[in-house]
């Protein structure tokens, strides 16, 4: 998983040249221990409450989306994330099922071995012994398949669930910038109204000071508008890259899964084919 994560990072043009990434890859000494990793650490709780607060803020302030593209992509992202979550849950169930099959096969083979050791019929005992070997082979195949499914299927899909969360966080950051922009525009309106009232009241000194504050607020609003436009364009570019990579990766994930599954089924078939002749010598 770490290898896939680092490959994804160095494949990004901007992140590839990041000094922290370069240091991580070239550092020869032991890496520093992670901090605030506890589930209930103070830093973790602060991040959680901040996320909850931002979520409620987004609910409270509705964004009138002027770009149809973002409206469509956010809806599409929600649907894709839900589909990936379901697929991840199914892949986890598949892994657990294969592990259970491996464990059951091991238990069954031990029982067969005990049965073979106390069987009076030599031919039947030999057949049970070969069946024990067959079940041991089958259990080992399911164990290897569960490990491959974990690495190539479940973890890979789980990684994309996290990537969809990051994508939604990017949409959320755009919403936050828009919200700050709207707040800045509202602040300009308030200051202009205050300046007008002061001028009508003859308080020219205070009105002049407020005029400077208004100009500063206008500059801030203009900067936020530019920032909003930039983040919107950047998200569009990154989303296009993400979609291209996602399609390529999902195809590779499914192909690897099917290849390993076919290989496992071939091994199972060979195990049963080796055992099949032994049944012919069992006395009836």
Positions of PLM-derived features:
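Domain-level detector for trafficking modules
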Residues: 1-66
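C-terminal, extended alpha-helical scaffolding domains
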Residues: 45-281
């Amino acid at each position: 998983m770490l290898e896939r994560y680092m490959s994804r990072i160095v494949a990004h043009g901007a992140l590839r040249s990041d000094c922290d990434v370069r240091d991580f890859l070239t550092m020869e000494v032991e890496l520093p221990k992670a901090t605030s990793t506890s589930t209930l650490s103070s830093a973790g709780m602060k991040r959680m409450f901040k996320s909850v607060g931002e979520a409620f803020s987004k609910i409270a302030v509705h964004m009138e989306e002027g770009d149809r593209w973002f409206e469509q992509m956010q809806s599409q992202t929600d649907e894709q994330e839900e589909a990936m979550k379901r697929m991840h849950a199914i892949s986890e169930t598949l892994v657990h099922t294969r592990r259970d099959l491996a464990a059951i096969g091991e238990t069954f083979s031990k029982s067969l071995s005990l049965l073979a050791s106390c069987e009076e019929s030599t031919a039947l005992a030999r057949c049970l012994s070969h069946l024990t070997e067959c079940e041991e082979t089958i259990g080992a195949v399911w164990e290897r398949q569960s490990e491959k499914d974990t690495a190539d299927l479940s973890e890979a899909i789980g990684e994309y669930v996290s990537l969809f969360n990051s994508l939604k966080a990017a949409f959320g950051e755009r919403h936050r910038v828009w919200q700050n922009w709207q707040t800045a525009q509202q602040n300009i309106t308030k200051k202009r109204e205050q300046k007008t009232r002061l001028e009508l009241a003859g308080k020219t000194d205070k009105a002049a000071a407020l005029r400077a504050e208004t100009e500063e607020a206008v500059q801030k609003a203009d900067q936020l508008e530019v920032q909003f436009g930039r983040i919107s364009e950047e998200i569009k570019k990154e989303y296009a890259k993400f979609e291209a990579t996602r399609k390529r990766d999902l195809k590779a994930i499914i192909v690897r899964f099917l290849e390993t599954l076919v290989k496992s089924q071939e091994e199972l078939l060979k195990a049963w084919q080796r055992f099949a002749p032994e049944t012919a010598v069992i006395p009836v």
